[in-house]
Every structure is written in C-alpha cells, then in structure tokens.
C-alpha cells in the first residue's frame, strides 16, 4: 500500500503541480514514477524506506492543495491549455492538453489506486482472519 501511495505522490507532482499549475519545482523524492523513468534525473528515490505515516502526511498536504485549487477554479480555467513547463521532465505528452484533461488524469489515477488499496486491504484482512482461525 505504501508503494501505491508513493506512486500517487508522483502523479500529484507530475500531473497536478507541473501540468495543471505549471510549476517547475522538483518532484517529491519519495514519489514512485513509471519504471522506465530515470529516477535520479527526476530527483526520485525509489529505494527510500518510508512508513505509511510519512507517506500519508505528504498525501494529506497534496489533497489539501487540490481541494483549495478546486474551490477556486473556473470553467474557463479548466478549458485553457495546461501550462506544462517547457522542459524535458515528465510527462512529455501532456503539452497541448487542456487543464481539465490533466486534472482528469490525476482523478483517474486516484480512483484506480483507491481500488488497488482496497483490494490490498481486503487481502490483508482475509490473511489476518485465516491466521486467527
């Protein structure tokens, strides 16, 4: 589950902060990108051993950032071309997409990984139940 949440840290940094907001700040080191992405070049540390609480603290801050932005965004802003920084960082294929499309990627990833976490928690719960028997 920690790895799934670490991937969402990366999704937030790449698709929300870089594509929706147009920020050029480095990725959060704890994030996990796709396997083909050059981790060190992007400031990522896939070997980091993090607790669930550490990752949840970052995810809470990220969720607050999205909630604050959503409370103020207008339909016109969602329709604009995303201000993706003009550099070679991830995701290169976001250029030319609307802000709404980039936000959609964030929300799709959140929903899909929610399902993965639920699946993993159910599996752990079943394992605990079988060990108690």
Where are these regions (language model features)?
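Acidic/histidine-rich alpha-helical segments that form the ligand environment
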Residues: 40-79
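Short, contiguous alpha-helical
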Residues: 1-45, 81-133
């Amino acid at each position: 589950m920690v790895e799934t949440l670490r991937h969402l840290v990366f999704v937030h940094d790449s698709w929300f902060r870089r594509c929706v907001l147009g920020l050029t700040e480095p990725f959060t080191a704890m994030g996990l990108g796709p396997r083909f992405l050059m981790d060190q070049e992007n400031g990522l540390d896939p070997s980091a051993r993090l607790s669930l609480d550490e990752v949840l603290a970052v995810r809470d801050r990220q969720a607050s950032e999205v909630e604050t932005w959503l409370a103020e965004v207008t339909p016109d802003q969602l329709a604009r071309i995303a201000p993706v920084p003009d550099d070679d960082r991830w995701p290169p294929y976001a250029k030319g997409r609307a802000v709404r499309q980039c936000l959609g990627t964030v929300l799709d990833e959140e929903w899909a990984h929610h399902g993965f976490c639920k699946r993993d928690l159910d599996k752990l719960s079943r394992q605990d139940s079988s060990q108690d028997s």
